[in-house]
């Protein structure tokens, strides 16, 4: 139904502060939501901007000053538990039970699995509802297709072939980069090794690993405790000592320096989010590469890492987000 008197609620929305991005509280999507809620339910929605990368601190400050939005979003469940212990948020379980019949779209989208994912098994309390993980593609391996073509190499399909490509990039730095040969980075990585080398590392997990083992250690989306995982780290150490990995990766905790190297055309390959070279439109890695190095320059996704059964396994996250 529609309220006879206009109601007002505040709702958190992430601000990623992307260069050239729109204000998340007044974007076209924000206007669509606000106008739709007002027209259909007579609810005035006020969006509150919270920094995506500073969300925990921002929410703590808003809660401390009494200005926290009515509806908050966070990836930090410990923060939710802290708020619950301070009586800063309400138990949703009674409301979910009472109003379930009025929320068919919510149940159709999330189902009991997501809605009750965080339910306290002892008290029955529900302090947060898990969103749907709409995109599960996760991570891909990317390599400079134009460099492969220039060196007469095929797209790598195995770890050995990928390794050989990195060696070729290193050994032909002057041909590929000319005066910038000293800036050659055959394979780039960050301090988040568990994410940025995941496909290589989990390829060392035996095919006969039990479902029990995957469940027990599956809480960690970096898979650090999966069986044989350390063998992937051994490979990375070998590559580093061979001069194939960005030697200064451990000095930087944000992505800007590494992204700039990719945009400038100094990086031959990397593992990252499934669409990483192509996101951010005209400021994407791919767009910058083609502008600086010609239409043929750019990265292409490849699958190179098979397990002991010759199968490419990608251990994806649960359907919560």
Task: Give names to the regions the model predicted.
Residues 1-321:
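Extracytoplasmic/secretory soluble proteins
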